[in-house]
A protein has these predicted regions:
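Short, well-structured active-site flanking segments
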Residues: 30-32, 92-95, 193-196, 219-237, ...
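Non-catalytic, structured segments within soluble enzyme domains
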Residues: 1-149, 153, 186, 280-284, ...
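A penicillin-recognizing enzyme superfamily signal
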Residues: 141-164, 173-175, 185, 190-196, ...
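Conserved catalytic neighborhood of penicillin-recognizing serine enzymes
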Residues: 1, 45, 109-118, 124, ...
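Surface-exposed patches in mature extracellular/periplasmic domains of secreted proteins
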Residues: 14-16, 90-97, 133-139, 161-171, ...
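Glycine-rich, acidic and aromatic/proline-enriched surface loops and short helix-turn segments
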Residues: 21-28, 45, 49-61, 121-124, ...
Length: 460
């Protein structure tokens, strides 16, 4: 319906102009004019055929086809655009050959400042709030400058100092208030080298961080942290999941199994509760899915983003209420007309109080005597580590009563890291960030003062 209304009000040329004036071309450039000056140092009206084709080629993937980060890929993409122009009859074969022969000189990348990955995410969100042709806008966001600077510092420092030895080239960090207000977002090691946002765009296997949803489904179904499951080798059909280092402890409590991230117990819990309930819990707390429902669901084979996963943990910090990540507080035109203003209020209740309290206790044990001991936060903290198969992804997502943060490390080509686990580098970086973000804070434990609200009845 919106597309039809736009076509009724504007000509095709006007619609194209609106689009080109706002679309992202990479390297921090929004709109054709800005991109022309950013890449070639000239106004758009003076672009050569080759330069125009290169900018057109950026629209498909402004980070991956970017001449700053991958000149060869950008040239190959430009050749594809020129060939398409020939086939469409817009230019001749001779013009295309001449353009390819002449090529161009690209301006060096600028020194970029500010939360570039966060800004890109805001631009991606804008179509949800404004329509094509909207006046220039003033946007008020949730970003906290000091937390953003600290997030960038700890992530890039860890990658520079420890990444080469560990075979880690990329990472991401997201921090948000318990209600989902994003305070810091870092989407990669170096924005100038790659504008691909690993915090919002990358979909990766969360590994054992997904056990959060197994735990919550079990607690909601009537299990308690002190209930016991067998920790021993298990086979489901032809699938034989294994514990880390093939170590098994026999009968263990649910609390100990989560704290120590025992795979065999997670699988047994998922089968006992029902994979459908586990998947439904993940979707309820914000994973976009589709969530796989095969036996391996318990070990985090469903790909998700760091932003989604951190938002799911925020539900617990928010006392069981919805905490969908958000970044835009208000949008105004330059003349001061309010286009959008976020309404504040308690989110919908997603989890019962008893489920939240029990989960806090279990997830606190992860940080005090479990796999995330290296986080080293002096205040009460809660979270879950995760490592995907062959050490391709390493995660830690955790929270306090004041702040929720998620950290991911891995490689864009999914090449395995050198034995990096969620309880190692991610947990340490998370701890460093949280200590800087909450210096000397006297935080109240989250296992008390739960508010009341309707929720599904317990059943086992």
């Amino acid at each position: 319906m919106l597309a039809l209304r736009i076509e009724d009000q504007f000509t095709k040329d006007e619609i194209v102009a609106f689009y080109l004036n706002r679309v992202y071309f990479g390297a921090g450039a929004y709109g054709l004019e800005a991109a022309s000056r950013r890449y070639f140092g000239r106004p758009a009206k003076n672009l050569t055929l080759y330069q125009a084709a290169m900018l057109a080629g950026l629209l498909r993937s402004p980070s991956r086809d970017n001449p700053h980060s991958d000149p060869d890929r950008a040239e190959a993409r430009t050749a594809v655009v020129l060939r398409a122009m020939v086939e469409a009859g817009h230019i001749s074969e001779a013009q295309a050959q001449a353009a390819n022969k002449a090529k161009t000189t690209v301006m060096p990348p600028p020194e970029l400042s500010g939360p570039r990955y966060f800004t890109d995410w805001i631009v991606d969100l804008l179509p949800n709030y404004v329509t094509v042709g909207q006046d220039d806008l003033v946007i008020r966001t949730t970003i906290d400058g000091e937390l953003q600077d600290e997030a960038e510092r700890v992530l890039t420092s860890a990658l520079a100092k420890e990444g080469p030895a560990m075979g880690v080239r990329q990472g991401a960090l997201v921090a948000m208030a318990p209600d989902g207000a994003v305070k810091a977002l870092v989407g990669g090691a170096d924005y100038r080298a790659s504008q691909f946002n690993r915090a919002t765009q990358a979909k990766r296997q969360p590994g054992s961080t997904f056990k959060l949803f197994v735990l919550l489904a079990a607690l909601e179904h009537g299990y308690r942290p002190t209930d016991r499951f067998l920790d021993a080798p298990i086979a489901l059909g032809g699938w034989k999941p294994r514990n880390y280092r093939d170590q098994y402890l026999g009968q263990v409590t649910i609390g100990d199994a989560v704290a120590l991230s025992l795979n065999s117990v997670a699988v047994r819990m998922s089968e006992a509760v029902g994979r459908g309930r586990v998947a439904a819990m993940a979707e309820r707390l914000g994973l976009k899915g589709p969530v796989r429902r095969d036996p391996s669901i318990a070990l985090g084979v469903t790909e998700t983003s760091l932003l989604e996963l951190t938002g799911a943990f925020a539900v617990l910090a928010n006392k069981g209420r919805a905490a969908a990540p958000y970044a835009i507080l208000e949008i105004k035109t330059r003349k001061g007309q309010v286009v959008f203003k976020r309404r504040h209020g308690p989110g919908a209740r997603l989890l019962r109080d008893d489920v939240v309290r029990d989960a806090h206790g279990v997830l606190n044990a992860v940080t005090t005597r479990g796999t995330a001991r290296r986080a080293g936060l002096p205040q009460p903290a809660y979270g879950k580590t995760g490592t995907s198969q062959d050490h391709r992804d390493a995660w830690f997502v955790g929270y306090t009563s004041e702040l929720v943060a998620g950290v991911w490390f891995g490689n864009d080509d999914r090449k395995p890291m050198k034995d990096v686990t969620g309880g190692e580098l991610p947990a340490r970086v998370w701890g460093a960030f949280m200590r800087a973000a909450l210096p000397g804070a006297n935080l109240k434990p989250l296992d008390s003062d739960q508010d009341e609200g309707p929720a599904p009845a317990a059943r086992r």
